[in-house]
Swiss-Prot record:
SUPFAM superfamilies: FYVE/PHD zinc finger. The lineage of its organism: Eukaryota, Fungi, Dikarya, Ascomycota, Taphrinomycotina. GO terms for cellular component: mitotic spindle; nucleus; Rpd3S complex. SMART domains: PHD. This is Uncharacterized protein C2F7.07c. Residues 90-102, 161-174 have a biased composition (Basic and acidic residues).
Length: 607
């Protein structure tokens, strides 16, 4: 039995200890009297020394037992209340069998303690002190188990006084949850009086009693009820009520956490600026992107909700929406169409029109900007920012290149010292003065876009759009393909090939040999046409080609511009002069030699 301080014990326990002390003192007095009486008998009866030790022990035990039963109670003043003399209750049946008493010694204290333990366990109507509560009432084994698990502080324990079980019923849990919900609803008022289904609500746990295999346990069920109280107080209440649930089940999932911030971009146009934020979802809108628009000076004083949240508040359940649509379909087809359109407008937030990604990114080098405008991505310039240039790579006052050669204008062959500015082409190595261009540039072009000089003919020739993800087809029979201008030469392959791009979004890879044959075929056709021209009007050809005698004395190639001027002098012979121009370009004409006569030129190029 556990030791317990004397001032912390009950009065009944102290009375039992005092009674034990009284009995022990009486037993000690009887022992002293017995020892003195035995010495007198031994002196008077000397011939009886042969008495056995066993009979002597039995006589001593019987005399001691009789002395204990026939003794009178002593006064309380003779008792000693010190803790050193506290002893257990002594049974009056005497010593056990086999025990013996030595001379001048009574029953030992250890034997008395053993007898006390046996008598406390077997004596009827006696209750041990550790089986009583603080109010001296018997404890049920279930209560004792619950007392060890959940010890209560203080002496006022109503559950132990009434001997009730600690198992909470479903009715008690429902009363607790209803009272806490009333307290939370009275503490704060909702901002919106409609039927909004708040996404930011924290699920309120409700406990239910489930019985499995005669074992009752509490289970927490999360519901979608609106919770308007303080979050920290609500979570503390839930942890206090749900005792049999682990801490992981009390915490909400990441999907159930409330929205802390709204979007930092407009949900309609995806642009930055000042927004009007919804109270139940993370959507944000410009004041002009809302339907209907709102002026910045006339903002709503109350909470504002977007169209989707308002629609969900009116039609919270899907059955109501389906029933409404079924009623509309019965009225007529036209009404059904308009009703669906109006319902779609009211239930969705406005979105700015923009081309689908499949259309805006179909062609190579074409894209859309932040606001949906058309831009050419291949013209944009990717700048490498640095501390010295601050993102500007174009220097209009360059005098020398990286290799040390002087930078001169392509047209006037002068440096930047003359006009104080010069432009570098982003597609070739030529430089131009802004005043030498036709028309002249008043300001320098932007650093974010590439600039192309007039030496390139892209601004004159028709521009073809190349598909970004075109289907590549290997042509099995390359015959029949002709040069139509939309050709890309692939120089990376081992065998030279030509890719022809058509508008159907397909790339046909053709060897270069058919195009060479087509080019030679065009030359033969031009030679035949030249012979026919000479046969029909020989004098006209002589007058036309006589104008080339001026260039025969000069050490320079025949410029194409002058050939075009010659063709413009006689509009009737444009076709023949252009054919002659093509022949002059492909012929092995030496600039040091005079221009051949038309007949010699025809014979030279004939096969």
């Amino acid at each position: 039995m556990d030791a317990k301080p004397w001032n912390h014990t009950s009065e009944a326990f102290q009375a039992s200890i005092l009674e034990d002390l009284k009995i022990i003192q009486k037993a000690g007095a009887e022992r002293n009297a017995k020892s003195s009486h035995g010495s007198i008998n031994s002196r008077s009866a000397s011939p009886n020394k042969a008495t056995s030790r066993r009979n002597r022990a039995q006589n001593g035990n019987s005399n001691g037992r009789a002395s204990v039963d026939n003794s009178d109670d002593g006064s309380k003043d003779d008792l000693d209340y010190s803790p050193s003399v506290k002893r257990k209750h002594v049974n009056g049946e005497g010593a056990e069998k086999g025990d013996h008493d030595t001379s001048n010694n009574g029953p030992s204290i250890t034997k008395l303690r053993r007898k006390v333990r046996r008598t406390y366990d077997t004596k009827d109507g006696f209750v041990a002190w550790n089986t009583l509560d603080d109010d001296f009432r018997p404890i049920v084994p279930d209560q004792e188990r619950s007392r060890k698990i959940n010890p209560q502080k203080g002496n006022n324990n109503n559950l132990l006084k009434e001997n009730k079980s600690l198992k909470t019923t479903a009715k008690d849990l429902s009363d607790i949850s209803s009272s806490s919900m009333k307290k939370a609803n009275n503490s704060s008022k909702p901002l919106f009086s409609g039927k909004l289904t708040f996404k930011a609500n924290i699920p309120v746990p409700t406990s239910e009693v489930v019985t499995e295999n005669n074992v009752t346990r509490n289970v927490t069920v999360y519901s979608n009820q609106k919770h308007l109280g303080n979050e920290s107080e609500n979570f503390n209440d839930m942890e206090g009520r749900a005792e049999d649930i682990s801490s992981n089940e009390l915490l909400p999932t990441p999907e159930e956490y409330p929205y802390r911030y709204n979007n930092d971009y407009c949900s309609a146009c995806h642009g930055p600026g000042n927004f009007l934020c919804c109270e139940t979802c993370p959507n944000s809108f410009h004041f002009t992107c809302i339907d209907p628009p709102i002026e910045e000076k006339n903002l709503p004083d109350d909470a504002w909700y977007c169209n989707e949240c308002k629609h969900h508040s009116l039609y919270n359940e899907l059955d109501e929406q389906e029933e409404l649509e079924s009623n509309v379909k019965e009225e007529g087809t036209m009404v059904d169409v308009w009703m669906q359109l109006c319902t779609y407008i009211d239930s969705h937030n406005p979105i700015q029109f923009h081309l689908p990604h499949s259309i805006s990114s179909f062609f190579r080098g074409v894209g859309s900007g932040v606001m949906g405008e058309y831009i050419e991505t291949d013209v944009l310039k990717h700048l490498k920012s640095s501390r010295r240039s601050n993102g500007e790579e174009r220097d209009p006052l360059l005098l020398k290149s990286k290799s040390g050669t002087p930078i001169l204008c392509f047209r006037c062959h002068k440096s930047a010292l003359v006009s104080q500015s010069i432009l570098a082409c982003d597609y070739c190595n030529s430089y131009w003065h802004p005043d030498c261009l036709n028309p002249p540039l008043a300001t320098l072009p932007s650093n974010l876009r590439k600039w192309k000089c007039p030496n390139h003919s892209d601004h004159v020739t028709p521009r073809y759009r190349l598909p970004e993800k075109a289907k590549v087809i290997r042509v099995g029979l390359p015959r029949g393909f002709k040069n139509k201008g939309n050709i890309v030469i692939d120089e990376n392959e081992d065998e030279p090939s030509v890719q022809t791009i058509q508008l159907q979004g397909k790339i046909r890879v053709v060897p270069s040999k058919p195009f060479k044959l087509n080019f030679l075929e065009q030359i033969r056709d031009n030679v035949i046409n030249l012979r026919k021209m000479v046969e029909q009007d020989e004098q006209l050809c002589i007058e036309t080609f006589s104008k080339f005698d001026f260039y025969a004395t000069r050490d320079c190639e025949l410029p194409l511009r002058i050939l075009c001027d010659v063709a413009n002098d006689n509009l009737e012979n444009d076709d023949y002069v252009l054919a002659l121009r093509d022949l002059l370009r492909i012929s092995k004409w030496d600039p040091n030699q005079p221009v051949p006569a038309p007949f010699d030129l025809a014979n030279l190029l004939s096969y």
